[in-house]
A protein has these predicted regions:
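N-terminal polybasic phosphate/anion-binding patch
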Residues: 1-74, 87, 140-143, 151, ...
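Short, active-site-adjacent cap segments at secondary-structure transitions
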Residues: 17, 72, 81-84, 89, ...
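Residue-level signal for inorganic ion chemistry
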Residues: 21, 55, 79, 98, ...
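Short clusters of hydrophobic/aromatic residues that line enzyme substrate/ligand-binding pockets
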Residues: 35, 40, 89, 161-163, ...
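Active-site-adjacent loop/tail segments of enzyme domains
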Residues: 50, 80-110, 139
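Short beta-strand scaffold segments in enzyme catalytic cores
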Residues: 80-82, 112-119, 161
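Anionic-ligand binding region
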Residues: 101-102, 115-119, 123-127
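Active-site oxyanion/phosphate-handling segment shared across diverse enzymes
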Residues: 126-203
Length: 204
């Protein structure tokens, strides 16, 4: 039997993830976590394990805050990284860093890896999963990369680009979930909610 859910909490301050939820027109609220991501990145080198651990940590933080308030909700947390030849590529801190990352990715296939963690506030069960999408770029000139960096789309984004915006002009191939490149593998979330929590997003 399908269950009725009063509230979904997206444990992320990412505008791209918020936009993904807005597109499917279901009620949700955003509550960002406050964890030290660098602590995890220093001790975990495996990209899949890293995104899973970060997603779980974000979920536990928000879940704890909601439980303190006796708030009933289902929480969805996520973390996305870019991986190229086994090396984790994070978010650029400045335009120079963004340019360096993009030059490294040009003409190559790289992986977008997203870890997700989902749980109810009234249930200790936590479902953790991940998705991998391969993305390939065209080869751009230095001036084209400089022009893209000036758009500031790189800010706060893994791999220093956003598929939703002008970066779509130089993405030549995607193998896997396109929504995962944005920040959430929506097919995974749909399946987990349906199979593990008895929820159907078509009936929200």
């Amino acid at each position: 039997m399908e269950k009725v859910l009063k509230k979904i909490i997206l444990a992320s301050k990412s505008i791209d993830r918020t936009e993904l939820f807005n597109r499917i027109d279901i009620p949700f609220e955003v509550q960002a976590s406050n964890i030290d991501e660098e602590k995890f990145k220093k001790r975990i080198s495996d990209p899949i394990l890293l995104v899973k651990e970060l997603a779980n940590a974000k979920l536990l933080y928000v879940k704890g805050e909601l439980i303190k308030k006796n708030s009933q909700a289902l929480i969805i947390a996520a973390d996305t990284i870019v991986e190229l030849n086994g090396i984790i590529i994070g978010k650029a801190k400045n335009p120079e860093g963004a340019s360096k990352i993009l030059k490294n990715l040009m003409g190559k296939a790289h992986n977008l890896i997203t870890g997700i963690a989902i749980s109810n506030t009234d249930d200790p069960k936590i479902i953790i999963d991940h998705a991998i999408t391969s993305v390939e770029f065209l080869t751009l000139s230095d001036s084209e990369i400089d022009n893209y960096v000036k758009t500031n789309e790189w800010k706060g984004r893994a791999g220093a680009y956003s598929i939703n915006d002008k970066a779509s002009l130089f993405i030549s191939k995607i193998n896997g979930s396109s929504s995962n490149v944005i920040g959430l593998p929506m097919h995974k979330i749909y399946e987990i909610l349906k199979n593990d929590f008895g929820l159907n997003l078509f009936h929200m």
